[in-house]
Amino acid sequence: MALLREILRQRRRGLTLTRNLTCYEAELFMVAGATERIVTAWMGIGLPWGVSKIMRHYVESGKVAMEEWSHLALGLRFRAGAMGVPFLPSLTMLGSDLMGVGGMKTLEDPYTGATLAAVPALFPDVAVLHVHRADRFGNCQIDGYPHMDADIARAASTVLVTTEELIPETETRRHPDRTVIPGFVVDALVHVPFGAFPHECYGLYEADVEHFDEYARAVDARGADGVAAYVDRHVHTPATFGDYLELFGGARLARQQARARELTG
């Protein structure tokens, strides 16, 4: 979240956002005019808040293009990019309307003659990732479910990483199994505790559900104007990420840390 906030502060335009599970940050990018295309498998804050109303408005009005893939297909696109191959064969999306997106093609299995989907590789220009810890060489460790981050990092041309903790390389060597992103693919590393907030960072702090409730109520009441006010208050007004965290307060951050400890033991 720290890096996404900085991109918004720089008032970038014309970006394509690609993420398997796209959350409210995409709404911030749409309303701020930073993105004109979103490639995803799902978009919303979470089940309690339903389908993104902002996404519906911007897509249906033609202001933003949305390209929908299956969860597996997007994962395979990143995996193909990480492997350096042009596509990977799969059964995903066959027989669905999603086959019409992104120039998806089919091929014949040379062994059985069956029809397969040829899922094209995805090579992001820039990958923005957050990890639990990293050493000074950029070797990154992720606790819990690593999602697609390792493949995304290998597929991207430029990789920007924020980390909760900086560790000595001796610690990296002591637990090589935890290192899922090697330093040779990382271009920039920034130490940013709570860098994923108000989202969760497994084992360290939980997502601030109350904050998302407040945000969703603002969207329900004011639509895109509510999002614009949110961007002004949480992105442009705080001069630093520390100032941004001050908007939540230390007690609130500590509460999310306690919730994470309760869930992970």
Annotate the PLM regions:
Residues 1-265:
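Conserved alpha/beta enzyme-core scaffold
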